[in-house]
Amino acid sequence: MNPRRKKRLTLAVALIVGVAGAASLLLYALNSNLNLFYTPNEIINGKNDTGIKPEIGQRIRIGGMVTMGSMVRDPDSLHVEFAVHDSTGTQVIVTYDDLLPDLFREGQGIVAQGVLTDSGKLEATEVLAKHDENYMPPEVAEAMGKQHKKLEYQEGVEKTAQY
């Protein structure tokens, strides 16, 4: 191999390695900032298609209906704790330390974003409530079997997060 070809080959290999390294760093940065959407059932049992569960400490979004009678407020602070359930009746406890949206109430659809703790609770940093009686966030509607109607709470059909 003559020196000119060797120099070109070295340059091409270095360029390919550099592009691959930059692409892997970009994908790593994007992956750490992803907020994956889960229903309570998917948090407990894993995604339907892959069976993958969210990891402890992972930043996720959860969508579902606020369980009737589950909201507990701390009288001395803004801390509130409530359960979110889906169409299967599976529940996950959500804790939040800020003002809840005006439209937030039990029996309504919400999307909460936060970090999953080792106790199976979601420490929410943001809670979004649906806008009116007929609206349901698209992610929640799709995850709950494309039912664009309010789920009825059934007593006795409760599952809580256990880790």
UniProtKB/Swiss-Prot annotation:
Sequence intervals crossing the membrane: 9-29
Record membrane topology: Single-pass type II membrane protein
Pfam family, one: CcmE
Record GO terms (molecular function): heme binding; metal ion binding
UniProt keyword annotations, A-Z: Cell inner membrane, Cell membrane, Cytochrome c-type biogenesis, Heme, Iron, Membrane, Metal-binding, Signal-anchor, Transmembrane, Transmembrane helix
Cytoplasmic side: 1-8
Gene3D superfamilies (alphabetical): Nucleic acid-binding proteins
Keyword Cell inner membrane carried by entry: yes
Subcellular location: Cell inner membrane
GO cellular component, one term: plasma membrane
Annotated heme binding sites: H131, Y135
One biological process term in Gene Ontology: cytochrome complex assembly
Ranges per topology, Periplasmic: 30-163
UniProt similarity note: Belongs to the CcmE/CycJ family.
Function: Heme chaperone required for the biogenesis of c-type cytochromes. Transiently binds heme delivered by CcmC and transfers the heme to apo-cytochromes in a process facilitated by CcmF and CcmH.
Protein name: Cytochrome c-type biogenesis protein CcmE
